Amino acid sequence: MSIKVFEVLSDMNIGGAGKLLLTRMSLSDKEKFDEQVIIPRGSLLEDEFRNIGYSPVFMKYCKDRSFDIREIINLCKLFKKEAPDIVNAHGCLSARIAAYLARVPVRIYTRHCAFKPSIYMTYRPVKSAIRYFSKLFSTKIIAVADAAKKNLTDVGIDPQMIEVIINGVVAVERYSDEKNRRVRKELGIPEKAFVCGICARLEDAKGIDTLIRAARVLLRSNKDYYFMIVGTGSLKYYLKELTDALGISSRVKFCGFQKDITPYLNCFDVNINCSRGTETSSLALSEGMSIGLPCIASDWGGNPYMVKDGYNGMIYPTDDFISLADCISRIRDDRELYKTLSHNAILRYEDELTALKMTRKTEKLYEELFLTASQRAEEEAVAK
């Protein structure tokens, strides 16, 4: 008999959590698990899940929000009717509460982000309340990085409740030299340019301005650098204006949102992450590692776990654009260092960051929690 699992996600757009869930469900063991996904009506994720063979169930109220009492009522009715063995709520508090009220045996909360807790959340009474309700509503918590786990324990959650399962991605296609040259030409990249790339939302937490300021420092002494920014967001016009103001717009290309970043990653010589908030384990960094791209990342959140300084890339102090520029120039100027970092990037990816490893670890946890819950139910039945 297969284990019935409901995955609940409140995202309206296709973000990191949605991509991870799509990847994992596409690789899941269909003989062992009967999975269903619940998303908001109108979410851009609907077609993506249909493309991998799932017909989503829709929420009405939790659209890019974690809590709505009306959704608790709706989900509670659904869970009582369908009787899932496991509910995994990807940040959706309403789903956790509904699963508790519906007496779902295994209730999981997956934490996809990391951020500095507000001061009031560190007060002892608040931490005690968070600890209590976390145990009440959740059987287990999955953190997608050590940084996410620390974030949770900092606000009082019992570390024994938390299982760290690092984000994994499917390896991207590595282009041949001939195809790479053709794609670089099609994208308008100057010949012999050293391409520094970043794939991220254009929001403050992603620190794109740090890369732009580092670009100005580098271009003062060497015009061979070229910068590609893949993504869109609310800071698009501000960042373009900053690039113009610094006089480097001819060497910085804003590529916009790209559903498939494979061509861009293949054009990069180095893959950069400038996060100053929320980062746990960057999917773009992992995808770049799968084709041997050295990484340069800020020391924020989960970046230092993914990027081992001097092994598969370099770590610089968050927001320090001078240090970022120095890391870029060192990797560019030292070909032996570049080759070593590139080789180790692939090893780092294969060691822990593959989609299949993430999927199998999650399924193993599901099976263990299901077995424990089943044994507990049998013991309670005998006791009665």
Regions found by a protein language model. Give the residues of each.
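Membrane-interface segments of envelope glycosyltransferases acting on lipid-linked substrates or membrane lipids
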Residues: M1-K384
